[in-house]
A protein has these predicted regions:
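Short beta-strand-centered segment that lines the nucleotide-binding/catalytic pocket of NTP-utilizing
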Residues: 295-308
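Hydrophobic anchor at the beta1->P-loop junction of P-loop NTPases
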Residues: 272-274
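Hydrophobic positions on the alpha1 helix immediately C-terminal to the Walker A/P-loop
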Residues: 284-285, 289
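Auxiliary tRNA-acceptor-end handling modules of aminoacyl-tRNA synthetases
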Residues: 13, 28-47, 61, 70-255, ...
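Active/ligand-binding-proximal structured segments within catalytic/core domains
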Residues: 2-6, 47-65
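P-loop (Walker A) phosphate-binding loop of NTP-binding proteins
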Residues: 277
Length: 308
């Protein structure tokens, strides 16, 4: 490929490609005319490919050191990914464990191991992951509806990822792993400066919201997408929506009550700001909050600042 691009692809190394607008690994084989766009880390898809590959690297290193462990990539937070690790021996994760996992990850990066892509019948993949004890992947694949599925192996360790991965571990040079709360935080590169780590940003409220969400998902038996798919197949979609709406309404009531207390305080609150990206539900939330504030005896005036 470099012979077709003697001047290079850009400032940063290419790690994936879009083929007819679908992300593919660099080992994807095209047998006829295709529209190809090469991607580096600064692109949204390129960053996603890098981070997925990095997560696989972390899982591989943890399994090498703690064969009975269960590692769960919980949520993106603080410019990284929060992960929980159950070592299988009943002990809490410690800094020594983090150091050992980091060292093993560096060894794998230095060895430049290949991420190998495999295509098999979905039934074969389900049976393989069931034997490995990956219940979440089994649940997801059982409800995918696909006849064939792609999975990846790293030095013989299999895992399932929906999107493409980088060609080899040698591409994953920038990252950091540290102890964070009751788990660990996998930090990733800055999207605009891939040679540097993204700056750490403490997000305690976001972390609390994610933790509460996981708690409620567990209570409802929805630990992964496969569980949601199965619930929908059982005709429970309407109930799930109603429960989610009830939980949100409960939160809005709590917010309204807190605002009411602050309005009646010695230094009263006079304005409440609601922020969020386009089409995220700000106006709807504003109307629902206004109703609850009126129920508290207040007379809120709502208006949109982006309605020019």
């Amino acid at each position: 490929v470099p012979s077709f691009f003697p001047d290079g692809f850009g400032t940063y190394p290419v790690i994936a490609a879009k083929v007819n607008n679908v992300s593919q690994g660099l080992k994807y084989r095209a047998f006829n005319s295709r529209q190809v766009e090469f991607l580096d880390y600064t692109s949204y898809v390129g960053r996603s490919v890098y981070c997925s590959s990095l997560c696989f690297l972390l899982c591989k290193a943890a399994k090498d050191l703690f064969p009975e462990c269960r590692i769960v990539l919980r949520r993106p937070i603080s410019k990284g990914y929060f992960c929980s690790l159950d070592k299988g021996d009943g002990t809490q994760i410690a800094q020594a464990d983090i150091d050992a996992i980091s060292a093993r990850m560096r060894e794998i990066v230095d060895e430049d191991m290949l991420f190998r892509r495999h295509e098999v019948r979905t039934e074969e993949a389900i049976e393989m992951f069931r034997e490995l004890g990956y219940a979440d992947k089994v649940s997801l694949l059982e409800t995918s509806g696909d006849v064939y599925v792609n999975y990846y192996t790293l030095d013989g360790t299999p895992d399932y990822y929906y999107e493409a991965l980088v060609p080899s571990t040698g591409c994953l040079k920038v990252w950091s792993l540290g102890l964070y709360r009751e788990g660990m935080l996998l930090r990733v590169p800055n999207r605009h400066k891939p040679e540097e780590l993204a700056p750490f940003v403490e997000q305690p409220k976001t972390f609390e919201v994610f933790s509460e969400n996981l708690k409620w998902n567990s209570i409802m038996g929805l630990d992964n997408v496969g569980d949601v798919n199965k619930a929908c197949r059982r005709g429970e979609a309407s109930d799930l929506i109603k429960i989610a709406e009830a939980l949100q309404e409960k939160k809005i009531v709590q917010i309204a009550e807190e605002i009411d207390c602050r309005v009646r305080a010695e230094n009263p609150v006079k304005i409440v700001l609601i922020t969020g990206p386009s089409s995220s539900g700000k106006s709807t939330f504003c109307k629902r909050l206004s109703i609850q504030l009126k129920a508290c005896g207040l007379k809120p005036i709502s208006f949109s600042t982006d309605d020019y």
